[in-house]
Each structure stands twice: as structure tokens, then as C-alpha cells.
């Protein structure tokens, strides 16, 4: 195919999933171009690697392309998509291009409603430490690699499998992980949870007879589909029937310490004493998936232990920004940023924050993501948001959706006030959020910024504000 397709264009190249695929294709020797409405770290990195990145969408951008890659976030009336179709240039969904990359190697696909990015990162890190040098495509920046994708020399490619648009059914990996199954992106499945579960069953049918499905049996919905999975299964979790099982898990100084018991292929493997450089029981489960795969692939135990102990995390997944001074100069607060935007993953992250910073006041700055999700999970949002000590709530990040009555930020604010668990502060514009946080904090607080939209820029703005303040004060001194 390479002698036919040489120039590949990405519409929305700065997106997490798109930029990773673009980087791997660059490393494979393809000429890559792309467009996006904004400039971010991903577009800057791709440009530095040789990609041609254009600001804004224009029909002329696809000139010379042999294929145009699009994600589901790109509408059908995008001028570049229309131009490609008029010129008979193949328009390739992102998941189909990922599937083509997987055909070059043995695929390890990480699926599930929550935890995909962290689990994919843990798997890639453990395999790399074991000397397998995997290729990886991740939906977040792997801090140890400084990128969300890399072309390795080994036999495996590790990637996220996206159920949001059912595109994971395009993949044919040899190893699959299902972390959990929850009601999200239900528009794709006609608001029928049974259809969503059936899609995950069909996902496991993509495995070859020699493949394995690595399933978290702590999740009741994963356990429910277990009898319908016909391919070999490895069960992981805290449950007694898990083959890769964590026991004695405890939080210690922002890390998780636990013992792993392993029963695979009728053999009892030596237990592992793990120190995971991430907080939260949910991350213990994510690490168990990586341990299961590593054990199957005969990665040395010492490499597994070392990789998890030295794991540097993923961008916007409980990303610690350290201590930031309070405006009154009386002390500091701890700043953490997280991508969580579904009530289940939010609850897990907030529980991890409580465990990592016991006894401290927890301040949450949250930007809801999508009106449909806010509508569908409204009561669950009210419940989880009511567990924090102080709350700053913004308007919904639309992600291209039209507003829905009674499913916006103000509606959530009103419902939280009625519930009476916490008194929310509604922040109209995201530009006002950094100052709103500074107005709300006290010395010793833990501040978590959370959401999948533009709130991701807020932690950097807070850090920059502190640096500029210190610089000004230093100059005055």
C-alpha cells in the first residue's frame, strides 16, 4: 500500500486519538499533513517532526492527499471532507486507520467506558520495561515518553479501542482488555444498554482463536457478558475468582501498595508485591490488566514491579501540578488536574484524591462535557458533585452539541443547591475560572480541576499566574 498512498491528511489533527496515529505514520515514512481550528502541544509536536499543520479548515488543504483521515468529531459538511469526496480521495475513519496500523503488528486493544488511557499507558510502560519495545497510540500524553504515540521495533502495538462510536469493532487485535462497561455515549446504541453490552461481546469475537480477552470481573456488566465470551479469558480484579487478583491494597503517600496473586493456565505464579505510582483503587485495577498481559507475554517479574513503581503518569489523568501559593500568601494549595467527565470516573478520582490527601479540604472545579451526557447522567452528577467540600461549576462544554433545556450548568447548580450537600459557585465563562479558584481556596486545600473540555487549560494558567506574580514581586524586591 505504501507505494500508492504516500500523502495522508488528518482533519482535526490535534485531537488526542488523531495526533497519535499521525505521529506513528510519520515515523513509518509517510508524508503527513493536517488541519485544526486550534494550536496545541500535539500540533506543535507533529510540526516539529515534519508534519504540515494548517490552522483552520479549507478545501485547499486536501490538495495532493492520497487519503483523508477523520474522527467522529468532524462533521460531514466539513469543507475538507466535502473536497476529498468530490475529488474521490478516500475518507478514512480514524478507527479504520488504527486498524490498518494494527495489521502491521500484533494488536493489544484496551476497551472500556473508563480507564482506557491509563490502562493503555500502563501496558505500554510495562512491556517497554520488559524489553518488548511496543508501538503505542494513547489518548493522552505518556509523561515518560513525552508523547501520546511512538513507533517501537517490537512485535506489539498497544492502543485504545473506542466504544463511543462503536468503531472498536473495526479492530482485530490478539489481546483485548475490557476495564468496565457503563452507560455512556448511548446515542450510538439507541439508548439501549443491551446493545452496548452486545457490542462489547462482538468486540471479543474479533480475537483469533489464540487470542485472549482480559476482563475486569469486579465490574458487574463485564461479569454479565462473561458467559457469552467464547475466546480464552483472563479475569482480573479484587474479586475472589480473579486469576490476577489484588489483595491488601492500601494508599501510602499518594501511591497504592498491594499484593498480586496470579493463577494462569493452571499454574500458580509467584505473588508480586507492587508499589503503584498512582492513587486510587481504580488504578490498582488498571495496573492488574497490565500485569495480566505482561504475565501472559512472560515479561520478567522484576520488570513489571519496576515499571509500575516508576510510572510517571499520563497527561490530565490525576496530573499533579504541585503546590500553588494562595493569594493571601498565607500558604499553598495542592493542584491536580483530571480528564474525568462521567460520574463513575469522577467518583473514582475524587476517592483517590481523598485517599492521597486524607483530612484535607477538597475543592472541585468542574466543567460538564456534552449536554446529552449531562441530561442522561443528571442525578448521578448531582450525587457525585455533592461529595466535595467546595465546588466551582462552569457551563457545559458543548463538543458540537446543541443546548438541551434543563441539562446545562445552571440547572446542575440549582439541583445541587436544592440537594443541600454543597453550595456551588457557578462560573459563567471559563476565562473566569482561574480567579474563581483563587478566590475560593484556603491554605492546605486540594484543588482538582476536572473535565474533558477547555478546563484543561486552567491548571497551566494558575501556574503561570503564580510564576508571573513571583517574578513581579522579585523585581520589586
Curated annotation (Swiss-Prot):
UniProt keyword annotation of Lyase present: no
Catalytic reaction annotation: UDP-N-acetyl-alpha-D-muramate + L-alanine + ATP = UDP-N-acetyl-alpha-D-muramoyl-L-alanine + ADP + phosphate + H(+)
Cellular localization per UniProt: Cytoplasm
Record keywords, A-Z: ATP-binding, Cell cycle, Cell division, Cell shape, Cell wall biogenesis/degradation, Cytoplasm, Ligase, Nucleotide-binding, Peptidoglycan synthesis
Principal EC category: ligase
Binding residues annotated for ATP, in chain numbering: 112-118
EC number: 6.3.2.8
Pfam families hit by this protein: Mur_ligase (PF01225), Mur_ligase_C (PF02875), Mur_ligase_M (PF08245)
GO molecular function: ATP binding; UDP-N-acetylmuramate-L-alanine ligase activity
Family note: Belongs to the MurCDEF family.
PANTHER family reported for this sequence: UDP-N-ACETYLMURAMATE--L-ALANINE LIGASE (PTHR43445:SF3), UDP-N-ACETYLMURAMATE--L-ALANINE LIGASE-RELATED (PTHR43445)
General function of this protein: Cell wall formation.
Record's protein name: UDP-N-acetylmuramate--L-alanine ligase
Amino acid at each position: 500500500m505504501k507505494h500508492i498512498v504516500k500523502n495522508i491528511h488528518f482533519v482535526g489533527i490535534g485531537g488526542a486519538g488523531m495526533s497519535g496515529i499521525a505521529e506513528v505514520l510519520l515515523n513509518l515514512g509517510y508524508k503527513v499533513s493536517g488541519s485544526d481550528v486550534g494550536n496545541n502541544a500535539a500540533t506543535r509536536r507533529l510540526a516539529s517532526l515534519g508534519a504540515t499543520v494548517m490552522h483552520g479548515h479549507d478545501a485547499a488543504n486536501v490538495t495532493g492527499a492520497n487519503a483523508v483521515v477523520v474522527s467522529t468529531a468532524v462533521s460531514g459538511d466539513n469543507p475538507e471532507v466535502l473536497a476529498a469526496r468530490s475529488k474521490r480521495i478516500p475518507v478514512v475513519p480514524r478507527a479504520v486507520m488504527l486498524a490498518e496500523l494494527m495489521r502491521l503488528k500484533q494488536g493489544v486493544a484496551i476497551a472500556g467506558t473508563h480507564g482506557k488511557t491509563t490502562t493503555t499507558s500502563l501496558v505500554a510502560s510495562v512491556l517497554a520495561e520488559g524489553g518488548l519495545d511496543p508501538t503505542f497510540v494513547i489518548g493522552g500524553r505518556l509523561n515518560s515518553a513525552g508523547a501520546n504515540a511512538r513507533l517501537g521495533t517490537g512485535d506489539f502495538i498497544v492502543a485504545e479501542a473506542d466504544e463511543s462510536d462503536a468503531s472498536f469493532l473495526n479492530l482485530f487485535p490478539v489481546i483485548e482488555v475490557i476495564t468496565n462497561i457503563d452507560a455512556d455515549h448511548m446515542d450510538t446504541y439507541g439508548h439501549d444498554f443491551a446493545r452496548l453490552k452486545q457490542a462489547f461481546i462482538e468486540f471479543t469475537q474479533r480475537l483469533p482463536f489464540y487470542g485472549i480477552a482480559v476482563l475486569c470481573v469486579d465490574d458487574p456488566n463485564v461479569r454479565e457478558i462473561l458467559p457469552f465470551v467464547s475466546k480464552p479469558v483472563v479475569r482480573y480484579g479484587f474479586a475472589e475468582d480473579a486469576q490476577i487478583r489484588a489483595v491488601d491494597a492500601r494508599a501510602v503517600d499518594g501511591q497504592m501498595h498491594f499484593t498480586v496473586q496470579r493463577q494462569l493456565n493452571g499454574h500458580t505464579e509467584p505473588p508480586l508485591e507492587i508499589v503503584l505510582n498512582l492513587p486510587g483503587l481504580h488504578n490498582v485495577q488498571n495496573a492488574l490488566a497490565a500485569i495480566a498481559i505482561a504475565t501472559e507475554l512472560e515479561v520478567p517479574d522484576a520488570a513489571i514491579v519496576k515499571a509500575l513503581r516508576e510510572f510517571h503518569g499520563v497527561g490530565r489523568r490525576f496530573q499533579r501540578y504541585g503546590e500553588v501559593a494562595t493569594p493571601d500568601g498565607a500558604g499553598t494549595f495542592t493542584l491536580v488536574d483530571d480528564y474525568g467527565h462521567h460520574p463513575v470516573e469522577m467518583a473514582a478520582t475524587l476517592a483517590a484524591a481523598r485517599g492521597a490527601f486524607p483530612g484535607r479540604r477538597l475543592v472541585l472545579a468542574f466543567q460538564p462535557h456534552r449536554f446529552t451526557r449531562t441530561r442522561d447522567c443528571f442525578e448521578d452528577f448531582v450525587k457525585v458533585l455533592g461529595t466535595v467540600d467546595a465546588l466551582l461549576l462552569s457551563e457545559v462544554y458543548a463538543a458540537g452539541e446543541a443546548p438541551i433545556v434543563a441539562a446545562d450548568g445552571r440547572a446542575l447548580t440549582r439541583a445541587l443547591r436544592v440537594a443541600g450537600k454543597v453550595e456551588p459557585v457557578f462560573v459563567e465563562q471559563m476565562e473566569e475560572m482561574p480567579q474563581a479558584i483563587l478566590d475560593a481556596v484556603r491554605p492546605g486545600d486540594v484543588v482538582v480541576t476536572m473535565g474533558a473540555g477547555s478546563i484543561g487549560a486552567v491548571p497551566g494558567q494558575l501556574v503561570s499566574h503564580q510564576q508571573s506574580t513571583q517574578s513581579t514581586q522579585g523585581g520589586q524586591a
